[in-house]
Each structure stands twice: as structure tokens, then as C-alpha cells.
């Protein structure tokens, strides 16, 4: 067996062991602030009644919460698992916290989840669905900081998690819109917003920053809706575009410590992590890495889970995908473990555990 194969096998065994072992750390992180899309969304869309991108109906949430919470999966998301590993309560969505704070029943002390499923880096991405774009998420955070509702010392020690862009790239290939930019120019427009995002959170006090890559967007079951996408394999053109974005994103993340004094940053290689699940499914407990557990039609990708006429699998833990676009809790668990204490194939220059325990001098 080659050394690389041995390393892959060792890593998969580590990912499959009890999450309790991985969750123990001497973290110095008092709070987590999360921005992005459905990989993180804890229910903001549910509290946004103008938003049509919803997962607030069964069987969403059925495997862990036993009720829908607004998360676009059957249980916990990456943000939830990382909160558990750090030793913090699960993050609440900003729009829920806002209501509770007005009622005097909560505060922002453990962090906030601003993510909105369906959103992107570009303002026009799914705008018609009423999602909250990254620009608005950042403005929500900025308002809290300017109103002194979050202590500066807490912000500086907190973990900032960011992941967005998959909806931008998927939408580039929608049949009813003609792209006005080349793939290269479109990706650069996305990355312009990445730079603005990092600049804004740094000015607001962020110092521990984790930016995650996109996964293989061209493999989601929802590609069955696209007339030019293959269903017997992943959509290559879409994945090429995602990898282009990821490569340039990593270059941006790598210079954060130089460009922003006092900041430390890591790049989570979500694409590579997911690709390993697809390449060695049995090692990670998967029997199906192509079809949605919950949905209907080709690949289970022609209908959203929970809508009239949907079908659901018997064991979601054996599926990579929960619905037409989103992974199962099992996938998120494995992904989160790789990001938390994985090696440089998964996250670099060091993992989230190191980022959370690293002492920062201001």
C-alpha cells in the first residue's frame, strides 16, 4: 500500500471515531460569528418571511432535532459541529436572536449565525428569493458592533467562519439567464467581494478567520434540472469553475496575515474533503454519493425534500446528499472533523483546533 493510501485510510478511521474525542480542546474562543450560505444557515431564512428559500417543514431536521429548524439538512450543519468542538452552545440565527434580545431573553455573548441559504457573493444571486446576501449579513454585524452590543475583546478572540459562492456558480449555468461575463471574469467578480468581506470583518475586529472553499458544486443532484448537465457523472464545467474560484480564494487567504497585522487565517479545502468521500465512499460509511436521500425525479434532484410527492431513503447516514443541493448530517459531521483536526490536505496552514487555541497578542 502506498504512503498516500495509508494516510487516507488512517484519516478516514480518525473521522469515523467518536466525535466526543475530537470535541475536547482548550479553546480560547469565546464566540463564533458565521457568514455564508446553506452550509452554515441555522434558520435565518425561516425568520425572514420575505424569503422563499425555506427548509422549515418536515423531514428537515428529523435525524437530530426531530423537528424542522430552518437548517437545510436532516440534522446539524458544519457550523453546529464546530460550535460543539469548541465547547459552545449551537449558534442561533441572527434574526431569531434579534427577536429574543428585544424581549430581553437572550444576548450575543456566544456568537451569531448570519448565514442565509441560497445567498451568494454577488448581490443578484437569488435576489428574487429574498435571501440575505453576504453584504447585508456583514452590515447586520457592523450595526451590532457600532452599537456596542458586542464587546471588542470578544470579537478579537472569536472565530469567524465564512463560506459562500456555490450559489453564484450554480446560477451561472441556469438556462434562463445568459452570462454577461466569461467564467474567469465572473470568478474575479466573486473574489472582489471576498476581498471586501475580509477587509470589512478585519476593520470590525476579526482576527481568527477561517474561509472554506466550495465543494464540487457540479455534483449536486440539482444539476438534473440543467438541460446541458450530465446525470451519469458530475458537471465538469461547473466543477472547473468552482476549482478556479477555490485556487484564487486560497491565494487570498494565504496573504491575510501579511496584509492584515495581527490576523491569522486558514483555508478549509472542502472540495478535496468531499472528493475523498466520493472516491472512497465505503471507507466513510456511504452507500450512495450521487443521489439525494430526500427528493424525487432523476438523482432525487428534481424536487425539494418535503414537497408534495417527495420520497425519502431509509438511512440518511449512508447518503452523501440529503436533498437536491445539500449534504446529510453524516457528511457534515465528517467534513467538520476534517476541518477541526485534519491535516494540510483538509485545511491549511493549520486546522481549526489550532486556530481556536492559538494565542493572539494585540
From Swiss-Prot:
It is an enzyme of class 3 (hydrolase). Residues 1-23 form the signal peptide. The active site is at 38 (nucleophile), 323, 326. GO terms for cellular component: extracellular region. Its main location: secreted. Keywords: Glycoprotein, Hydrolase, Lipid degradation, Lipid metabolism, Secreted, Signal. The keyword Lipid metabolism applies. Its EC number is 3.1.1.-. Belongs to the 'GDSL' lipolytic enzyme family. This is GDSL esterase/lipase 6. It comes from Arabidopsis thaliana (Mouse-ear cress). The gene is GLIP6.
Amino acid at each position: 500500500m502506498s504512503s498516500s493510501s495509508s494516510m487516507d485510510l488512517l484519516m478516514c478511521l480518525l473521522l469515523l471515531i467518536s466525535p466526543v474525542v475530537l470535541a475536547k480542546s482548550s479553546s480560547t474562543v469565546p464566540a463564533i460569528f458565521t457568514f455564508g450560505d446553506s452550509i452554515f444557515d441555522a434558520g435565518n431564512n425561516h425568520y425572514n418571511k420575505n424569503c422563499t428559500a425555506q427548509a422549515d417543514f418536515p423531514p428537515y431536521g428529523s435525524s437530530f432535532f426531530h423537528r424542522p429548524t430552518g437548517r437545510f439538512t436532516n440534522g446539524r450543519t458544519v457550523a453546529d459541529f464546530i460550535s460543539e468542538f469548541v465547547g459552545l452552545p449551537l449558534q442561533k440565527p441572527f434574526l431569531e436572536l434579534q427577536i429574543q434580545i428585544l424581549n430581553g431573553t437572550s444576548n450575543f455573548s456566544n456568537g451569531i449565525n448570519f448565514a442565509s441559504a441560497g445567498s451568494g457573493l454577488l448581490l443578484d444571486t437569488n435576489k428574487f428569493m429574498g435571501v440575505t446576501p453576504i453584504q447585508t449579513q456583514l452590515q447586520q454585524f457592523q450595526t451590532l458592533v457600532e452599537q456596542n452590543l458586542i464587546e471588542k475583546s470578544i470579537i478579537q478572540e472569536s472565530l469567524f467562519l465564512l463560506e459562500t459562492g456555490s450559489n453564484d456558480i450554480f446560477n451561472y449555468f441556469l438556462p434562463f439567464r445568459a452570462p454577461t461575463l466569461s467564467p474567469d471574469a465572473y470568478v474575479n467578480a466573486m473574489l472582489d467581494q471576498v476581498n471586501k468581506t475580509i477587509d470589512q470583518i478585519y476593520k470590525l475586529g476579526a482576527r481568527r478567520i477561517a474561509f472554506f472553499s466550495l465543494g464540487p458544486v457540479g455534483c449536486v443532484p440539482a444539476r438534473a434540472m440543467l438541460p446541458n448537465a450530465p446525470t451519469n457523472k458530475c458537471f465538469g464545467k461547473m466543477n472547473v469553475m468552482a476549482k478556479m474560484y477555490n485556487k484564487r480564494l486560497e491565494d487570498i487567504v494565504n496573504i491575510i496575515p501579511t496584509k492584515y497585522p495581527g490576523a491569522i487565517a486558514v483555508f478549509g479545502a472542502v472540495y478535496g474533503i468531499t472528493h475523498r468521500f466520493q472516491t472512497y465512499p465505503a471507507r466513510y460509511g456511504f452507500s450512495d454519493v450521487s443521489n439525494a436521500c430526500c427528493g424525487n425525479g432523476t438523482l432525487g434532484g428534481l424536487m425539494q425534500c418535503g414537497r408534495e410527492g417527495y420520497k425519502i431513503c431509509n438511512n440518511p447516514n449512508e447518503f452523501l446528499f440529503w436533498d437536491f443541493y445539500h449534504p446529510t448530517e453524516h457528511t457534515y459531521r465528517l467534513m467538520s472533523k476534517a476541518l477541526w483536526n485534519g491535516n494540510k490536505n483538509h485545511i491549511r496552514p493549520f486546522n481549526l483546533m489550532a486556530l481556536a487555541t492559538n494565542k493572539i497578542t494585540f
